[in-house]
């Protein structure tokens, strides 16, 4: 799925735009026991409660593609005949109305998910979307539809204890201590099937993880029985390892600054282009950056080999997963220097009297914790 397709579905999660008739789910305690079930008609729920359910489900389609939103790809064999795909299709085709199928799905989540000591809420909803046709100007015609997209969306939300506070009890006309449990934003979720080319793709699902460095592979194994792509954090670490191992002493400040600047430029250009497809960087593209910076051919070949070993042949990477384009950070054992990437060139490395130093020009005013200071010798 691309950004436009995700955004199109996100707009469904409003009271006047969806065809969700019921909300299903269950509340699970930290002993992995179902405490209660949810089976609510959206038509009779108070509007504020219905909107809260929709907002929680909508968050399962939030975040960045390739970071929080991850493509799950089923093999042809799985789609043809597998328990995991059959269950997902049954959820969708039954419109979640079959309680036995829902229970089987709940148990897959409960038996695999590790949220520590947290209680959590599993939410499920089914929607049917009359996909508007697009005219020759790429504009949607709300009155014309060629296809119906039937899908299931799920999210898993931690349920947290609220602090004990004073509250007013109208029946007693008094204030008393009160506490309770509140539903937090989803930790994970998914959409099935995927909405590719604005149509159902039963070979794919879209998985959501709030944390980009912890994508709950245990749930992906249980529900989808497939291996997810590397998380954004894993991609970044693998890329850094491939680079540092191949380059050795050649991995210096100037080279890393240049790589960061080139990748950041690509990210900015992609953002300005409004291209809905995720930005991709091939291993050859990354190797070309090294070549442009004068890295020896032998080291470039070693880098390519390392990347193929880490990511697989023909792999493409998302530059946004490899760097933090919003900052440039330099760390030592005892200090951290963080700069606007536009000014990363200000940091230099020098060896003075046998010791390594980081140098930053201080031509303007200098402050320490808000205090303006002068430099000795000025």
Where would I find each of the regions flagged by the language model?
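Post-signal/leader-peptide non-cytosolic segments of secretory proteins
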Residues: 8-10
């Amino acid at each position: 799925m691309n950004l436009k397709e995700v955004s199109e579905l996100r707009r469904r999660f409003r009271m006047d735009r969806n065809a969700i008739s019921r909300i299903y789910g269950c509340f699970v305690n930290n002993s992995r026991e179902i405490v209660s079930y949810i089976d609510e008609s959206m038509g009779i729920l108070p509007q504020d409660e219905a909107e809260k359910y929709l907002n929680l489900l909508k968050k399962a389609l939030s975040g960045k593609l390739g970071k929080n939103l991850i493509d799950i790809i089923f093999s042809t064999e799985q789609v043809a005949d597998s328990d995991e795909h059959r269950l997902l299709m049954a959820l969708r085709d039954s419109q979640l109305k079959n309680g036995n199928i829902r229970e089987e799905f709940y148990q897959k989540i409960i038996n695999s998910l590790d949220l520590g000591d947290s209680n959590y809420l599993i939410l499920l909803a089914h929607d049917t979307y009359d996909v508007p046709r697009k005219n020759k100007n790429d504009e949607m015609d709300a009155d014309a539809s060629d296809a119906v997209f039937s899908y299931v969306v799920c999210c898993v939300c931690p349920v947290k204890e609220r602090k004990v506070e004073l509250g007013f009890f109208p029946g007693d006309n008094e204030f008393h201590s009160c506490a309770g449990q509140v539903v937090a934003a989803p930790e994970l979720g998914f959409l099935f099937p995927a909405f590719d080319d604005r149509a159902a793709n039963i070979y794919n699902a879209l998985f959501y993880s709030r944390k980009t460095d912890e994508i709950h592979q245990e749930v992906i194994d249980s529900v989808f029985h497939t291996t997810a792509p590397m998380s954004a954090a894993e991609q970044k670490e693998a890329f850094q390892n491939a680079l540092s191992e191949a380059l050795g002493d050649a991995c210096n400040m100037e080279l890393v600054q240049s790589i960061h600047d080139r990748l950041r430029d690509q990210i900015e250009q992609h953002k300005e282009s409004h291209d809905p497809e995720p930005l991709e960087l091939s291993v050859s593209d990354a190797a070309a950056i090294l070549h442009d910076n004068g890295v020896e051919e032998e080291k470039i070949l070693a880098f390519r080999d390392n990347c193929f070993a880490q990511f697989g042949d023909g792999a493409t990477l998302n530059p946004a997963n490899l760097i933090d384009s919003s900052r440039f950070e330099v760390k030592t054992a005892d200090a951290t220097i963080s700069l606007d990437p536009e000014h990363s060139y200000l940091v230099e490395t020098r060896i003075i009297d046998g010791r390594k130093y980081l140098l930053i020009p201080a031509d303007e005013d200098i402050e320490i914790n808000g205090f303006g200071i002068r430099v000795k010798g000025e």
